[in-house]
């Protein structure tokens, strides 16, 4: 692991280093589901199971489920025989449950439910899901299936503008994704920790490149080319900070040794659409370990990191092409983050 160091003298430290491809050789690829059409021209519902990580607890039966479907009009007169108009595609995250039911039974029961879809707004545009129908195999997910759920529209809907307000809409499920949670540890980093900033600290970030079996340009993603000439997309996530006392920064070599000793292993899952799972097999500093919640199995959902890129992976195969450690100065606390901007009638920008 060799770092290329920035030539910018204003940066106290900045370096990029690639991890070995062996760190994601097991679990670095998610295959897409090939669609099948029945004699009526409708897509046959399917399921797929993903088992990222080291599978330390193979029989704990905890799983994360997310289903995908067509948002279509609800016909007022079903006997008309007219085909329902498909508006867009949406993801319906069900969350974590513990079940010993066969995946096919889970899928069939999901498809038997009546799932309604409604567009609304809060701080952002929202999608509201509601469902009705008898539950047997899906009892571990009873709370979300009977109580309803609401999500940021950009995270779960491909084209929210196509969801009609004047007509009732329903979700016709065609795919169920099951991620087995067979490793001990947490499956989400607290958002407050992801936004944690510290003076005189070095931020430890990961830059992940993905090969996606899709036309990136058509999806509005420019991307870049890897060493084989294949177009790839990338996203960045934050793991923690290397903090030194007395107002000093750690050196590049020190951080390099710390990262090497962690022996990180990467794999892909389907939590929230696409998720990056990280396992720490080696030694980690106490401070960094505390920032990670004292867990050695971590998960980052692309739904939260980059929802636009996440939507592109819904029905396309995806593979890790490259993972790089990025060391950057942590953004100082003095830097203001403006979530809201107000402009008065004189054109002056006011602090939110």
Swiss-Prot record:
Transmembrane segments: none annotated. GO terms for biological process: virion assembly. Its main location: virion. GO terms for cellular component: host cell cytoplasm; host cell nucleus; virion component. Residues 1-20 are annotated as: Disordered. Disulfide bonds: none annotated. Keywords: Host cytoplasm, Host nucleus, Host-virus interaction, Viral matrix protein, Virion. It is found in: Virion; Host cytoplasm; Host nucleus. GO terms for molecular function: structural constituent of virion. It comes from the Viruses. Plays a crucial role in virion assembly and budding. Forms a shell at the inner face of the plasma membrane. Homomultimer. Interacts with host ANP32B; this interaction promotes M nuclear localization. Belongs to the morbillivirus/respirovirus/rubulavirus M protein family. This is Matrix protein. It comes from Hendra virus (isolate Horse/Autralia/Hendra/1994).
């Amino acid at each position: 692991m060799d770092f290329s160091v920035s030539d910018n003298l204003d940066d106290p430290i900045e370096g990029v280093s690639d991890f070995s491809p062996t760190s994601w050789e097991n679990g670095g690829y998610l295959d897409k589901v090939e669609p099948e059409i029945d004699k009526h021209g409708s897509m046959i519902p399917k399921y797929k199971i993903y088992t990222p990580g080291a599978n330390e607890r193979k029989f704990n039966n905890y799983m994360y489920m997310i289903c995908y479907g067509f948002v279509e009009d609800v016909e007022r007169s079903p006997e008309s025989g007219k085909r329902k108009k498909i508006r867009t595609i949406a993801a319906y995250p069900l969350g974590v449950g513990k079940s010993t039911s066969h995946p096919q039974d889970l899928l069939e029961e999901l498809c038997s439910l009546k799932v309604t879809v409604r567009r609304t707004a809060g701080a952002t545009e929202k999608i509201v899901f509601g469902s009705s129908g008898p539950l047997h195999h899906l009892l571990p997910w009873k709370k979300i299936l009977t109580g309803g759920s609401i999500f940021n529209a950009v995270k779960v809907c491909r084209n929210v503008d196509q969801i009609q307000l004047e007509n009732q809409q329903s979700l016709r499920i065609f795919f169920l994704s099951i991620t087995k949670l067979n490793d001990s540890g947490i499956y989400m980093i607290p958002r407050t920790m992801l936004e944690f900033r510290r003076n005189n600290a070095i931020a430890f970030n990961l830059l992940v490149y993905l090969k996606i079996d899709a036309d990136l340009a058509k999806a509005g993603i420019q991307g870049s080319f890897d060493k084989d000439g294949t177009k790839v997309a990338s996203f960045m996530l934050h793991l923690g900070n290397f903090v030194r006392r007395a107002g000093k920064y750690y050196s590049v070599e020190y951080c390099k040794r710390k990262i090497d000793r962690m022996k990180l292993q990467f794999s892909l899952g389907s939590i929230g659409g696409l998720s990056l799972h990280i396992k720490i097999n080696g030694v980690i500093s106490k401070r960094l370990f505390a920032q990670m919640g004292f867990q050695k199995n971590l998960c980052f959902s692309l739904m939260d990191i980059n929802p636009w890129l996440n939507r592109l992976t819904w029905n396309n195969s995806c593979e890790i092409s490259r993972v790089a450690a990025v060391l950057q100065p942590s953004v100082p606390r003095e830097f203001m983050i403006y979530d809201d901007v107000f402009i008065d009638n004189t054109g002056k920008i006011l602090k939110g």
